[in-house]
Each structure stands twice: as structure tokens, then as C-alpha cells.
Amino acid sequence: MKKNLFILVALFGFIVSCTSNQQAVQTTMEPYAEGKPYTRWWWFASEIQNEDIKYQLEWLKENGFGGVEIAWVYPMRGDSTVKHPKWLSEEWAASVNYAKRTADSLGLGCDFTYGTLWPFNAFDLPDKYGTRSFYQKESPEDRTLTWDHPRKARIINHLDKEAFAYYAKQMDEGLKDAYKGSKSGIFVDSWEVETRHLWTEGYGEKFKERFGYEIEPLMDKLYQPGYEDVYYDYMTLMSDYVLYDFYKPFTDHAHTQGAFSRSQCGGAPADLLTAFMLVDVPETEAILYEPNYGRIPASAAALAGKDVVTSETFTCLYGWRKWGGKGPYQDEEQVADMRLIADALFANGTNQIIWHGMPYNKKGNGKNDNHFYASVHVGPDAYFKDQLKDFNDYMTRVSQYMRKGKVYSDVALYLPLEDSWMGVEYPDSLQMPWVWGEYELRYVFAPDYLAGYQPLWVNAKVLSEASFNEGTLKYGELAFSALAVDVEWLDIAALRQIVRLAKDGLPVIMAREPKQPGKNKSEEFGRLYGELMKLPNVSARRDDVLKQKPLLEGENLPDFWCRQDGELLYIFVANPAAKKLKYPLRYGQAFEDQGSVREVVVNTVAGPQSLQLNFRPNESLLLKVDKEGRVEVIDLGFTAKKI
């Protein structure tokens, strides 16, 4: 992350007085600086005791964790008789403040989920600030699984920055002292607001002003075949609301509190690459989102000049069951399976693990007391406790290497956002109870002809702000040798930028002839495409355009991620068994791997170097490449054992 993002107000060692008899230490330590895994820390509504807070934080420190994200949830098992402090009360805040000061004293980071569960909701939220669909005259007040369960709450309107401001004022009053000390992240989880027919006041007027026709008479046909162009226009405006009435205000507001934003933008009905670029720390999730998805937030971080890409990790490892019980094989998790997921994430750009997660428990209690239903169980009684410290140390080492220098870049790859909006719904085979729309971009991969390159996703906004000079496409600190566009649909605004850059000399792969999405078609689209394809530096064939050799060449290449640190390259190559992992994992899936070999060529600045990659079962490789072309395999020093 850019260095100036996390500069703190006071110098290391400056002591400030706080409530109670403890003191908070102001520190210049950057969040996530050491790369040690964090854990989500489930605080079930109850009487949280300081001695238990201290015990759990000390245990985390001893076991290789770097910090926590406190997440406030319902009473265990939904038991409304459990005594607990009122949400955001002074008594509630006292425990939070103690946790933050104790974390600071131990050198641990401390982030906060910005609310009780998700999406953001409030108990006394006025109707005008609540979320609603086109067909709802009032916002439903139907959230009950919250800290104050069964008290009903209302989800905020994520399309109205005034609604967020109202909500944030309440949250900041509760967290005002917890913001002191080391810099904390405030976290927003994946979208999880109902998106079908989503609406807000003034939407219809803005839509007509922008597109020249009324959307209201078409809302009941929005998801029907034949109305894809209308849905595309609806999503185009919806995206602007989501980006600039929610994600940008969320980040801007975090800065006013001396905090930073961390966000899973997954599931948002928006231009996802831009959404991830707007937050300070973009976050993916695995394995409810499969590891390939992580390349979107990783690309966003690289484009926006941010170093840290986090992942909520090991969620629903072996599957999901409804709230009220434990998931499949919960409390029996194999470290080797978890490593498979972690390595797949690293090979798609993640460089900071957030465990999901650890429940608050009294000292001496454990997984049969407080537990979260969709989570790996982290705690002194974890099934994998004997390997936990070593596993955390392994993930720390990889994370540290994957922070060195900057992201290596060679090919810019256009993200098929328009395809997803024109596709509307996933086929039944790809839908899940919580997934229906292609707008989520869950199943996008780089085309096979870019195997061995490290393509980063780009979009129309990036292209509009990029330039081509001195033989490269430049955006921020990144430089690309070529642009690949392999889509069925392409917005005319993006096509205009592609033509501009190609006329300046940018090599462009136009793998297919795209069509113009949206209800308002233009003859300009065809003319622009014709101009583009007449340019000598534009072709449908990769070999006519790409002069730069791929970083790796070979058959059936594993997934990898590369960082460039001056004249050195660090390439994390995931075990082939980690490629294209699917939800859910089979129990013990990692042990099905018997080891494998890949013969590859590493194309270095000094020339091609042949290399045999020997993958031991359930292990990945880290390569260091210097300017002379020497390739060193770095020992990552960890083998997961079967439990």
C-alpha cells in the first residue's frame, strides 16, 4: 500500500492517556506490514470479559498471527436471553477499547467490521435511508440476526451516500476511542444486499436523462430474454450509484477517522474493478469465491498502486449448511487442504491472509461453546493446533515475498464486464443459493493463449486514463507491452479508448469482433471497429501482436504470481493441484496429489533458462530470478501433515 496511506499522527513510543488505567501506544507500524495472517474474531453478543480478551490476543501472538478483525454477531445459537451490553453503548465500547489497546501493546493489528453482521444495518434507521426494491414503497425492517437479536433492524440504502453518512455517525460514536492508537481498518463484507429490482429515489429520472427512455415500464421484464440491452443500461447507472454513493464515501469517511477501508466488493452490482480500486485494501474470499476471482482485486490493487491484497480465507472449506449448526467436517479441517487454498490465492495475487475465523470464548471454553457456523475453528482447541504456528509462518513468508517491489506486468487484459451485464443470469449449473447474476464475474479466466504471461485485468476507466509512449501502455506505476480484448460485447466508450491507444501504437489483440451493448446503438461503433482493424498493430491473432515472450513457457503450466523488485523477480508457482480449485473441496483433497514435474522455460532478461519444476505432494515453489538469468528455488520450509 502506498506509504503515505498509513502515516500515523504521532511518532512511535508517544503515549496518550485513555479510559481505564491502561495507555494506548501510538505506533508508526503499517497495518499488515509483517504479512502475518489476521483472523476474524467473532464476538457473540454476551458479556465480553477483559481477561478473556487478553488471553485470546496473547494466544494469537504466540501462534504467529499479526492481528484481528473484530466482528460483532448475534448471541450464540440465537439465544435472546443472553445478557449483553446494548449495541454501541458505553459498556459495549469499553470492551472494544480494551481489545484495541491490548492489541497495540502486543504489536497486533486490530480492524473492525463496520457494523453488526452484514450488510450494514441500523436499529433506528429512518425509512428514507433504508434499502428497497422498485416494488417496495417502504424499506423492510426485517434484520433480526444482529448483536441485539431479536431486535429488528433495517439495511441501509447503499445507493445513497446520505444514508451511509447517517449510519457512519452512529458507528463512529461507538468506535471513537477505538480509532486511537495504531491505525485500524474498517471493513465491509461482500455485498449481500438484494440486487433484483434494486432502486432508490431519483433513479428513474436519472435513467431517462442518461438513456432517453423510461425504465419504469420495463422493470417487470428486466430479467427476461430479449431485454438484455435494457438490463445493461440499468446496470450501467446502478454501477455509478454503488461506486460513488457507497464505496467512495466509505473510503473517504474512513480517512476522516484516521482509519483505512478494507472491502470485499464481491457481489456488488457495479464495475467491480473500479470498486476495488476505490478502497484502500481490496479483499477477495475463498472458497465461496473460487481463487481465480482474486485476480480482480489483485489487478485493482496493482493499478491503484496499493501493496496489500487480503483474502477472507477458508470459509466453508468443505461446503455450507444453513445457520444453526456446523458445516461439513467443521472442527476436522486438514491443514493440507487449507494450504491448497492459500497457495491458489497467492498464485492469483493475494498477499495477506485473513483467517475465517476465531470465536470469542472464555478461557477454558472452546469449539463446543462459541463457534461460527461457516468457519474454520481457530483457537487453542483447534483440530490443527499442532501445525498452526508453522502454517502461519509459511503464509507469512509467502506474503512477505509477494510484497517485494511491485507487481510484474506484461499484458493488459480487458475484463469482460459488458459480457456479464448482457448475460444477465448464470445458467442453473452455475447458480448457488446466494449467486444468480453474471454481474458477479465469479467465473472469468484469462484465455489459454495468454498462458505463461501475467495478465492484469483492465477496464474502460483504466484505458481512458492510460497513455501509450516509449513502446508501452502506461498506467500509474505499471507498464504493459500489449492489450488483449477477448469479449462478445464492448461499450462504445471503451472502444473509443482502444482506438485512441492503438493509433498511438499500442499492440492490440482483438480476439473477436464485439457488439455494442445497450438499447441505444450507434453507427459510430462499426466505423470505429473498422478503423481499429485496419491498423498494422491490431490483429485477432496473438502471434501477430505479442512480441514479448511469456514469462514462463511449458505444457500445462501451473498458476503463478510474480513480483518485480528492482532487477530481481520473485515468482510464486502454486502446486498444479491448486489450479482451478472448485467449491467445495473434497475432504483430504490435497492428499490426492502424488507430486508432479513440469519442464518450463523462464524467459529472463538474460535469455531463456530451462528449468525442471519438481513439486512434492502438496507443496508449491518460489523462484528467484536475477539479472544474469540465474534461477534459484527458495525453500519455503513447510510440509502439511495429515491429521
Q: Where are the language model's segments positioned?
A:
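Acidic, contiguous N-terminal accessory segments
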Residues: T19-E30, V633, F638-K642
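Mature N-terminal segment immediately following signal peptide/propeptide cleavage
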Residues: A24-G67
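Acidic/aromatic-lined carbohydrate-recognition and catalytic surfaces
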Residues: V73-K161, A165
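Carbohydrate-binding surfaces of carbohydrate-active enzymes
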Residues: P37-Y38, Q49, I53-K54, G67, ...
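Bacterial Sec-dependent N-terminal signal peptides
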Residues: M1-Q26
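Phosphate/oxyanion-binding active-site loops and adjacent basic polyanion-contact surfaces
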Residues: Q49, I155-A168, Q387-F391
